[in-house]
Design a protein with these regions (language model features):
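Hydrophobic ligand-binding cavity/cleft-lining segments
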Residues: 1-39, 44, 138, 144-147
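Alpha-helix N-cap/helix-start motif
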Residues: 18, 28, 59, 85, ...
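Glycine-rich portal/gate segments that line the openings of hydrophobic small-molecule binding cavities
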Residues: 36-82, 87, 95, 100, ...
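Beta-strand/loop substructures that line and gate deep hydrophobic ligand-binding cavities in soluble
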Residues: 78-130, 134
């Protein structure tokens, strides 16, 4: 299980917008090459959303299934990509004059990565933890500087 948290000087509704609106996705998820539009009916539990991602020299599609959601409070996705499946959740908590965003996630390697995971587990865990923290820092910058 991975976890990262950050305080952002913005109300929960503004942060939720940046977490869920495809037009803001690239501002805090730099690996996203193309964010797919929201499905008919919008974002809701059971909806599939997705993106085309480029990381580590590979370009691939990622499918996200909204597993749970309470607008302006939390959203959780089940993610499926070629090298891993994951569960990722964002909790949005009013925190004095700021808002605390807590991201948690669990990952299951698949494909070629699954066989290498026992050897590379420590390295992969550090990379995932660092990536989660850096994405939250980018989210804070995007939310706080967007007019």
């Amino acid at each position: 299980m991975y976890k990262a948290a950050i305080e952002i000087a913005a109300p929960p509704a503004r942060i939720f917008e940046f977490l869920t609106d495809p037009k803001h996705l690239q501002s805090w998820q730099p690996d996203v090459v193309e964010a797919k539009p929201l499905p008919p009916g919008g974002l809701q539990v059971g909806a599939h959303v997705g993106a085309t991602v480029q990381e580590y020299g590979r370009r691939f599609d990622v499918d996200l299934l909204v597993a749970s959601m309470k607008r302006n409070e939390h959203i959780a996705y089940r993610m499926d990509a070629p090298t891993a499946s994951a569960y990722v959740e964002y909790q949005i908590v009013p925190w004095g004059p700021k808002t605390l965003v807590v991201s948690t996630g669990a990952m299951r390697p698949k494909g070629f990565l699954r066989s290498l995971y026992p050897l590379l587990q420590g390295l992969i865990q550090r990379m995932v933890q660092r990536k989660m923290a850096s994405r939250l820092m980018l989210l804070r910058t995007a939310v706080e500087t967007h007019a």
